[in-house]
Amino acid sequence: MYTTISTDAPGVTLINVFTVAPDRQDDLVAALDRATAEVFVDLPGFRSANIHASLDGVRVVNYAQWASEDGFTAMLKRDDVQAHMKEIMTIADAYEPRLFAVRAVHNVEHRP
């Protein structure tokens, strides 16, 4: 499933901002990419993930969509997920995960 940003789409969005040393940014992106490909894509409720690296090298953002808050919460309790997060936290200095709901969307193709 592709990432769809819409106020009509059910589900929740995880925006997780990681702080990382510039020389470890690529390592963090690779670890998040690997965890997504190996674990998250097969979990119930997972919809999509997009990993962004800041141009200054000190942040990585994981923008992920889940079918529901319950599905997201269930994922956090899994041993395989916790193992990947443990690895990720050996690379990242800090992280700030938050769940969001889409409230407004604007784009060139769909101007009012």
Model regions and ranges:
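Glycine-rich beta-strand-turn "strand-cap" elements at beta-sheet edges
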Residues: 1-12, 19, 50-58, 86-112
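A general boundary/transition motif marking the beginning of the first structured unit of a protein
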Residues: 4, 28, 73-76
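Short, well-ordered beta-strand segments in beta-rich or mixed alpha/beta enzyme
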Residues: 12-19, 48-78
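Short, surface-exposed ligand-recognition loops at beta-strand->loop->(often short) alpha-helix junctions
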Residues: 19-32
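An amphipathic, aromatic/His-enriched active-site/gating alpha helix that lines ligand/cofactor pockets
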Residues: 34-47, 65-99
